[in-house]
Amino acid sequence: MLRLLFGFLVTCFLLLPARAAEPQYAIFAGGCFWCVESDFDAVPGVLETISGYAGGKSANPTYEDYAKGGHREVVRVKFDPDRVSYAELVGVLFRTTDPTDGDGQFCDRGFAYTTAIHALNERQAMDAKAEKIKAEAELGRPIVTPVEGAAKFWPAEDYHQDFGKRNPIRYWYYRNGCGRNRTVEKLWGDRAYAGVSH
C-alpha cells in the first residue's frame, strides 16, 4: 500500500507543470527610442518595452532636458528568458542599429542618440561583451557601443510610449526619412534585423 501511495505521489509530482522562469530586464540605447521600442516589440519572447532615459546625472529627466543631464534615449526590455536569451537581445540591438557610429544614430546626432548597453548584472555584462566580439568579427570592423554598468532608468513621457503603434504614419515617415532601415540593411546585409519578426 505504501509503495502504491509513493508511486502515486511521484507521478503527481512529475505531472506538475514546470515553473516558468521569472521575467528579466535589459536596458539598451540604440538611437531614437521610438525605433528601438518598435524593433524589440517584434522579438518573440519580449514581454514589454518602455522608452526612457538613462546614464546621466540629472534626476527626473524630461524630453526637453534629458540630453543636458547627460542621458541617452534608452528602452527597458522585459523578456522571458525561456523564450529569448539576453545574448540574443544584444544581437538584436547590434543588428537593428549602426553600432560602428560613435556620434549618434542615422539622422539623430549627439551623445543622447549613441548606442550603449546597460548591463544590470555581471552575467549580462559578460554576455554583452561576448556578443560584441561576435558582431565585430561578423562586420570586420570595431563596434563602438559601450557595455556600461546598471544605470537608473527614468521612463519617458506617456506620449513616447508605443509611439509607432499609436502614430503609425508619423512614425513611418520619421523612420524612413531618417534612413534607419536603409543604413542597417547596407551595414548588415541579410543579417539586418535578425531576430526581429516584422
From Swiss-Prot:
It catalyses: L-methionyl-[protein] + [thioredoxin]-disulfide + H2O = L-methionyl-(S)-S-oxide-[protein] + [thioredoxin]-dithiol; [thioredoxin]-disulfide + L-methionine + H2O = L-methionine (S)-S-oxide + [thioredoxin]-dithiol. InterPro entries: Met_Sox_Rdtase_MsrA_dom, Met_Sox_Rdtase_MsrA_sf. The keyword Iron does not apply. The keyword Zinc-finger does not apply. Keywords: Oxidoreductase. It comes from Rhizobium meliloti (strain 1021) (Ensifer meliloti). Belongs to the MsrA Met sulfoxide reductase family. NCBIfam families: msrA. Gene3D superfamilies: Peptide methionine sulphoxide reductase MsrA. The gene is msrA2. Pfam families: PMSR (PF01625). One of its GO terms (molecular function) is peptide-methionine (S)-S-oxide reductase activity. Has an important function as a repair enzyme for proteins that have been inactivated by oxidation. Catalyzes the reversible oxidation-reduction of methionine sulfoxide in proteins to methionine. The active site is at residue 32. It is an enzyme of class 1 (oxidoreductase). This is Peptide methionine sulfoxide reductase MsrA 2. Its EC number is 1.8.4.11. One of its GO terms (biological process) is protein modification process.
